[in-house]
Amino acid sequence: MIKIIPLLENTTTSSQYRCKHGLSLYIETPNHKILFDLGPNDLFLKNAKKLGVRIQDIDTVVISHGHVDHCGGLGAFLKSNSIAKIYLRSQAVDKHYVKVFGIPFYAGINAKLVKGDRFVFTDEVSVIDDEITLFSNVQGGCKLPKADGNLFVKEDGRIIPDDFSHEQNLIVSSDGTKTLFCGCSHAGIVNIVDKAAQVVGCVPQTIVGGFHLFEPTTKRYEKDEYITMIANELKNRDADYYTCHCTGPMAYETMKKQGLRLGYLSTGAVCKLYE
């Protein structure tokens, strides 16, 4: 069994849990206690306490990419946990920006915190052990979200379009199952699923994460035609899907109407797979 508890997501199952734009998933496997992303601040810690999740027992952290809504809670985590290995792409510590009405705002990680041997920079494919595989550098033919165009990185003093080389994805292998976890799917959720299938030899039975169909700074969704196309492409890759965060509730409903086997994970939900 794999247990998933969103410690922080844009929405909440109850007023007792705080929510904010961002993502932090607690993943419990037979051999690991994993945090997939750390949200924008320390709210995931407060929710974890209410949900009975002991942050000090986390043994593995995966930072999906270097945007603040996924790694802003790093400082708070480091104060609460002294044992976990923290896996990220080396490019995650680059200076990342989001443009709002053409004006760039810093939206990256606090790079000063990334030091010491508990931080591990990952390769294009990194097999950590029998349960955990990380992969990045996703390419593919499926059109990318338009909202990617608002995201940038500073290189040699210039702000240039983000190539998302800092984005990585997690595959958990357990009892003959494969579960794919994505943060924001900037490389395109369809392309990510296809690369996961290349890495592990099959389409994962379950796919969990944000699909980047909603742009938070402008409050705009991708066009319905694009959302419908993504839903139909995912249907062709037979799996169960759980989404959250940057997909947005309207896009979620649109995809559900296409017949995609899709659930939504809000802060405080408890999802048990393969019972």
Q: What would you call each of these model-derived segments?
A:
Residues A92-Q168, M255, G263-Y274:
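Metallo-beta-lactamase
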Residues H70, D163-N169, S173-T267:
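Cap/insert and terminal regions of metallo-dependent hydrolase folds
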Residues I27, D37, A48, H65, ...:
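Divalent metal-coordination and catalytic microenvironments
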Residues H32-I34, T60, I132, K178-T179, ...:
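Structural motif
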Residues I2-L51, D163, E167-F181:
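Conserved beta-strand hairpin/beta-sheet module of binuclear metal-dependent hydrolase folds
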